[in-house]
Amino acid sequence: MTKKNESVNESVNESKSESTIAAEFQFDPSLMGEEFNAPRIPRLPYGIVINDNPAGLFIPEKNALKAGWFQMEPTSLTEIELPGGEKSKGIFLTSVRMIILGSVSPYIRYKTSDELGDMRGVIVGSYSDNHHLLDKKTMEVASEYLLLFLDTNNNLLHTRPIRIRFKNVALWSLLESLEDFYMAMEMQFAQLAKTKASGKNDRWRALCIFEAQYKGTKEGEGSNKSYCCKVEQFTLPTPENFQTLFLGAMQKYAKVWEAYDMNVCALQLSLPESKQLLLS
C-alpha cells in the first residue's frame, strides 16, 4: 500500500469515527472541527518568597491543594507569618529541586504599600528599558516564575505548575545563579553528547533541575537592613550527576513539556495589564 493510499484510508477512518461519535451523542459533526479549538489561560496556584531567617519558598495550603501536591499530611505543613502579620499554613521549602517552565522578563512596578494610593502595584515597564526610572523607595523590580518541584528521585511533587513572584534581592540572586547553572548544563550536555556547545531555548532548559539551598541574608544600609531570600548554593552538573539534573528520558520530559505547552502563557495573568503605566 502506498503512502498516499494510507493517508486516504486514515482520513476515511477518522471521518467514520467522527460520524459514529456524533450519532451516538446526537450532535452535529461540524461541531467537532478544530476551528473551535482555542487555548485558555488557566489561573495558576501561587507561592510566596519568604524573606526571613530561615528563608525559602512558601506555598499556602490552599494553593498546594490547587497544585495537586501529593504529600499533604499535617506533619508536612509549616505555619509561616506573612509580611502583613497574617499566619498561614503550607509547604515551606528552604531547599528545592525545581524546573522552570518559563518566566517574565524583569519589570519595574510600584510597591504595594498603602501610602502609594492608586499607584500601588502599577507597572512602570520592563527593567531593561526603564531601569533609569527606578526609585527604590517607592518601586521594586519583579519577575514571575512558573515552577514544578521534584523529589530526589525526580518525581513531580505536584500536578499543576506554581507561579511565584521574585522581587529585588531574591530576584537578582536567582537570576545570577540560574545564568551560571544553565550555562554549565549546556556545556556539560555538549561534552556528553559530543556536540558543539550552544545556548538552549526555554523548552530545553525546562528539563534542567535546579537544585538549590536558600538562606536568609541581611541586606540594606544602616537601620534599614532586613532579611532577604538568597540562593546560598546550588548543584553544578558533572558527568556523574548529570542524569539526576536533566530529564532527558522521554517518559520524564513528556510530562514537563505538556505542562510547558499548557501553562507558560498563563504567566501574563500575574501582570495587572489594566493598571500598566508605560513610561518612555
Question: Model segments located where?
Answer:
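OB-fold ssDNA-binding interfaces and closely related basic DNA-contact patches used
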Residues: 2-161, 222-225, 238, 279-280
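Polar/charged alpha-helical tracts
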Residues: 23, 30, 176, 180-191, ...
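Amphipathic alpha-helical interaction segments
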Residues: 77-78, 180, 265
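Extended serine/threonine-enriched, polar tracts that run as long, contiguous segments within proteins
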Residues: 143-237
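Accessory, usually C-terminal, subdomains that scaffold auxiliary metal cofactors
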Residues: 200-204, 213-278
